[in-house]
């Protein structure tokens, strides 16, 4: 009872003191609410503006006076808490300033402290029946207001998202109508600023019916080619389901001769192979037998061994594993069972085991082998320079390194092996800690990380700064009489020396925009106003600032007018003058209102007439009715990310918009027309989501997931090939702009284009008309679907619009088509053309024998010949030339972003699977994932993308083609080394060995540092055409 009374008394005392001292002083710095991770330091600042009296500061925690110790202590007026604890330090903090001379007190508003922590997570079953499975992720932890707790669900190792019968609702997972496809172990992860934890024990769900299907067939009856069209009989035992424990053992002559070695130690980046030699009897060669490799108990790779059994790519065990992902590094050889790695990474470490399973029998497993990876020595992340506040109690600079064995981290100053300055130490984790920061701590500090692999270093610059403070703040309000003199003081201290800027009513004041005879700006920051006028009255602000921050104080100036100022008008008694002034003012105001109303009505009439004219033209062009403006407006409101046209390259392409631009409309009408045109464009691209089917996720891109699916053929419009028109316009523009040049130059350019066009027609194996007939006869079109998951990310939305405008503006057989846009609900889908053979990089790896594509009785496809490689390069150059003529840039040209069909037609596309499948080919630079090994130096240094930077990337693409995409450019260098050498201009390029001699010079010119010296795509196309003709001869 006594403790409660004391707590209530403390809160009442704090609230009363907030109004005691308001007239004599106020706070210059108030304590701010904070959220920190547990065991981190906290600092509450508190400072009063009363610099003329002696003040004493106290702190209250939840209404109680704080008992200070080594962990919680007060320095000056500020409160410092070392290693914040959630059990003791959470709550509200109030600063109390006491004037020792008068005894007056003032209390600051309470500041809240929240401690972020994360201990454990567990899966709880809330309900389970035939219609619904309901799970909850219970988390022991807390998050701040700015960063809520993030929950992710996994089935086995597969990350779940809201899809079909799966719904994610905050901490709960709801599966409606669960079936056999939903069997597995469900686990959840929780993450916040304190870290990430996964539930130790998950929930294993198993549907009620579980048995192995068996196919009944007569003797000497051949297996049908399609397994999915057979009828399976599933019989379970009475009283329970049949499981693997009821299966018989495999025949003894089916066995594994040699499994993986007991323990293998491999360096990161080196190749290796795991052995699994097996014996397969002749009488079992026609049976369905699977060879599987497991990592840490989870299925990694599998292949069918039976000679006549079809290769379905699916396992006939009940488990679902997320480790069955596409990875070009891993190859499972069917002949000898060997699992080979092209290059080892740190995540490959684990326990490996191979298995043989005959259908309907227990699997045969080898002895497990352990693969250990010697991780490369590197910084994670790279240490960065930092500004430290002078007199700060504790400041930290982190330096974390990874490698095998664990590296030792140490710090040196100014590149010397001398000891660190006083009050500077290094903790066990390699963090550099500064205590009681002073000016002697300035300098360059180098972090050294070393182990048996060697030593790496990183240098950071430490600068000590002082936050600007008011030594003499402006005090107000100030009252003065007209024609008087006012002096407003404003002096500041800080390091670097702060600058002082005055403003009046939020408008900056300087000697250039004020009366120099009346306004004087003194060197110490004081503002003096002589001969004060009535218009000088207002709010004056003084802002001080340096590299450590900004501060501001306001003061109100009140100008009192003398009684003589209004005496002549009042004593004159001439009311007619006043009446006349009022009448004139009202007449002018009324005329202005009438003018504005008239203009509004006139603009409205013009807009309606123009709208009717545009609708008539749109109806004639489309051959049918178009959605009205109201519908377009509604669509724009549903998608704020696509409500405006942001690409400056898009032009008016219709006759109606061209006529509208030539009209004498006002600026307001032009903006309205542009907005309606943008909405009309996106409405034309609209596709119903119901038209998509069989969506399969193949990876993740920069703004969301990427799928491959099918689109109804009825929703696919016939393509409009603008290649000929674009070439004609380009030729005319070159002739018009090149009037000052020689006629021979123009003639040679036209000849090159004719040769380029003729060569392209020669290598086309399928006519365009035949392709159109094939598309019309097909019931479904294979498409690539890019989802916009990050709707609130402005950068992701901008990139989504850029790609949308790029593919919408181009209609060329060398560039994939944009079929439409699904905007009915989130996430929005961009639907692009896709091919039956997929991306070009996987095709090159398959022809090089790096991807196992062989089926029973067939062999891997042969490598590409030189003429075929030149044909692929020529088609890519034609597609990129179309992008250049449309005044766009690609920014991510590579073989992974091109597609190829079974008719050997190559198109430029934009899958950009930078998050998982091709994550090794991207590097995070300036908080953006970039393909640094394909980028020109100006893109990395200045973030400047032009057609010349696409030509630089095209040279790398040709290098990939002649190397069959079996290795990365400059794979001997790390990503950081590539960035450093590219910025320094020391990254050297060389063409592939198989490159024809006639192309070496022009390909090397693609990589020159000066963009103006690089060739154009038309010149590259002409050179490739000549090379193809010479190879054919």
Curated annotation (Swiss-Prot):
The gene is otk. One of its GO terms (biological process) is retinal ganglion cell axon guidance. Residues 1-22 form the signal peptide. The modification Phosphoserine is found at residue 678. Residues 692-1028 form the Protein kinase domain. Residues 720-731 have a biased composition (Basic and acidic residues). This is Tyrosine-protein kinase-like otk. Pfam families: I-set, Ig_3, PK_Tyr_Ser-Thr. Residues 617-679, 718-760 are annotated as: Disordered. Interacts with plexA; component of a receptor complex that mediates the repulsive signaling in response to Semaphorin ligands. GO terms for cellular component: axon; plasma membrane; receptor complex. InterPro entries: Ig-like_dom (IPR007110), Ig-like_dom_sf (IPR036179), Ig-like_fold (IPR013783), Ig_I-set (IPR013098), Ig_sub (IPR003599), Ig_sub2 (IPR003598), Kinase-like_dom_sf (IPR011009), Prot_kinase_dom (IPR000719). It is found in: Cell membrane. The chain crosses the membrane at residues 582-602. It is a single-pass type I membrane protein.
């Amino acid at each position: 009872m006594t403790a409660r009374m004391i707590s209530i008394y403390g809160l009442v005392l704090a609230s009363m003191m907030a109004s005691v001292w308001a007239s004599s002083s106020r706070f210059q710095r108030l304590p701010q609410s904070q959220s920190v991770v547990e065991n981190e330091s906290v600092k509450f600042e508190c400072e009063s503006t009363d610099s003329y009296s002696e003040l004493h500061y106290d702190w209250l925690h939840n209404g109680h006076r704080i008992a200070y110790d080594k962990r919680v202590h007060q320095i000056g007026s500020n409160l410092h808490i070392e290693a914040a604890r959630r059990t003791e330090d959470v709550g509200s903090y109030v600063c109390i300033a006491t004037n020792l001379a008068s005894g007056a007190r003032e209390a600051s508003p309470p500041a809240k402290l929240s401690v972020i922590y994360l201990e454990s997570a567990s899966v709880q079953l809330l309900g389970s029946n035939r219609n619904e499975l309901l799970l909850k992720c219970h988390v022991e932890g807390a998050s701040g207001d700015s960063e809520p707790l993030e929950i992710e669900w996994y089935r086995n190792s597969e990350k779940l998202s809201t899809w079909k019968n799966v719904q994610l609702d905050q901490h709960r997972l709801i599966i409606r109508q669960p079936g056999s496809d939903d069997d597995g172990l469900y686990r959840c992860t929780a993450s916040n600023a304190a870290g990430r934890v996964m539930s130790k024990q998950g929930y294993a769900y198993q549907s009620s019916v579980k048995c192995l299907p068996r196919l009944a067939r007569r003797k000497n009856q051949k297996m049908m080619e399609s397994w999915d069209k057979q009828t399976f009989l599933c019989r379970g035992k009475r009283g329970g389901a049949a499981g693997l424990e009821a299966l018989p053992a495999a025949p003894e002559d089916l066995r594994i001769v040699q499994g993986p070695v007991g323990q293998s130690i491999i360096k990161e980046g080196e190749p290796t192979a795991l052995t699994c030699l097996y014996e397969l009897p002749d009488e079992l060669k026609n049976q369905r037998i699977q060879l599987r490799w497991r990592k840490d108990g989870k299925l990694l790779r599998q292949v069918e061994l039976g000679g006549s059994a079809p290769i379905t790519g699916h396992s006939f065990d009940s488990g679902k594993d997320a480790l069955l992902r596409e990875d070009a590094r891993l190859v499972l050889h069917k002949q000898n069972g060997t699992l080979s790695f092209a290059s080892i990474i740190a995540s490959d470490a684990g326990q490996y085991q191979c298995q043989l399973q005959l259908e309907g029998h227990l699997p045969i497993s080898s002895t497990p082998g352990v693969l250990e990876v010697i991780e490369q020595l590197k910084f994670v992340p790279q240490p960065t320079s930092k500004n430290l506040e002078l007199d700060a109690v504790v400041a930290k600079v982190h330096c974390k390194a990874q490698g095998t064995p664990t590296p030792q981290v140490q710090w040196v100053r100014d590149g010397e092996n001398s000891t660190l300055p006083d009050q500077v130490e290094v903790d066990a984790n390699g963090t550099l800690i500064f205590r009681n920061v002073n000016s002697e701590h300035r300098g360059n500090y180098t972090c050294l990380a070393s182990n048996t692999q060697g030593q790496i270093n990183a240098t950071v610059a430490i600068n000590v700064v002082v936050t600007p403070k008011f030594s003499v703040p402006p005090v107000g309000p100030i009252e003065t009489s007209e024609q008087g003199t006012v002096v407003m003081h404003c002096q500041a201290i800080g390091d670097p020396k702060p600058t002082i800027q005055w403003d009046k009513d939020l408008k900056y004041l300087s000697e250039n925009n004020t009366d120099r005879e009346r306004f004087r700006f003194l060197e110490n920051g004081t503002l003096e106003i002589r001969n004060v006028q009535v218009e000088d009255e207002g709010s004056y602000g003084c802002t001080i600032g340096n590299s450590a921050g900004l501060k501001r104080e306001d003061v109100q100036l009140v100008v009192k007018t003398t009684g003589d100022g209004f005496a002549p008008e009042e004593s004159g008694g001439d009311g007619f003058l006043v009446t006349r002034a009022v009448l004139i003012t009202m007449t002018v105001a009324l005329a202005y209102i009438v003018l504005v109303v008239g203009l509004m009505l006139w603009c409205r009439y013009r807009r309606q007439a123009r709208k009717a004219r545009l609708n008539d033209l749109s109806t004639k062009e489309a051959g049918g009715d178009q959605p009205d403006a109201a519908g377009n407006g509604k669509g724009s409101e549903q998608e704020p990310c696509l409500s405006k046209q942001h690409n400056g390259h898009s032009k008016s392409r219709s006759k109606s918009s061209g006529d509208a631009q030539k009209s004498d409309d006002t600026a307001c009408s032009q903006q309205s027309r542009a907005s309606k045109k943008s909405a009309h464009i996106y409405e034309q691209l609209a596709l119903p989501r119901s038209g998509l089917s069989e969506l399969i996720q193949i990876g993740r891109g920069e703004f969301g997931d990427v799928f491959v699916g099918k689109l109804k053929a009825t929703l696919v419009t016939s393509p409009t090939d603008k290649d000929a028109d674009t070439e004609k316009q380009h030729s005319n523009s070159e002739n018009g702009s090149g009037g000052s040049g020689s006629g021979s130059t123009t003639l040679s350019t036209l000849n090159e284009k004719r040769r380029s066009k003729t060569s392209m027609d020669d290598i086309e194996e399928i006519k365009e008309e035949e392709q159109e007939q094939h598309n019309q006869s097909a019931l479904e079109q294979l498409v690539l679907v890019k989802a916009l998951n990050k709707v609130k990310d402005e950068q992701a939305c901008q990139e989504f619009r850029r790609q949308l405008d790029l593919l919408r503006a181009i209609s060329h057989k060398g560039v994939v088509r944009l079929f439409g846009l699904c905007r009915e609900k989130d996430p929005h889908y961009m639907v692009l053309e896709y091919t039956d053979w997929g991306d070009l990089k996987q095709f090159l790896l398959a022809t090089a024998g790096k991807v196992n594509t062989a089926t029973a009785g067939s062999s891997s496809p042969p490598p590409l010949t030189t003429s075929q490689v030149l044909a692929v390069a020529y088609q890519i150059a034609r597609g990129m030339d179309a992008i250049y003529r449309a005044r766009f840039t690609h920014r991510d040209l590579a073989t992974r972003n091109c597609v190829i069909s079974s008719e050997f037609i190559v198109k430029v596309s934009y899958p950009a699977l930078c998050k998982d499948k091709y994550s090794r080919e991207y590097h995070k630079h300036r908080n953006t994932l970039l393909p640094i090994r394909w980028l020109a130096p100006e893109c990395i240094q200045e973030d400047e993308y032009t057609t010349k930077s696409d030509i630089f990337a095209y040279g790398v693409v040709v290098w990939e083609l002649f190397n069959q995409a079996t290795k990365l450019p400059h794979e001997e260098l790390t990503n950081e080394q590539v960035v450093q050498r590219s910025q320094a201009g020391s990254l050297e390029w060389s063409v592939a060995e198989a490159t024809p001699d006639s192309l070496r010079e022009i390909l090397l010119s693609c990589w020159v540092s000066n963009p103006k010296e690089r060739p154009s795509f038309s010149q590259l196309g002409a050179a490739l055409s000549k090379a193809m003709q010479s190879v054919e001869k």
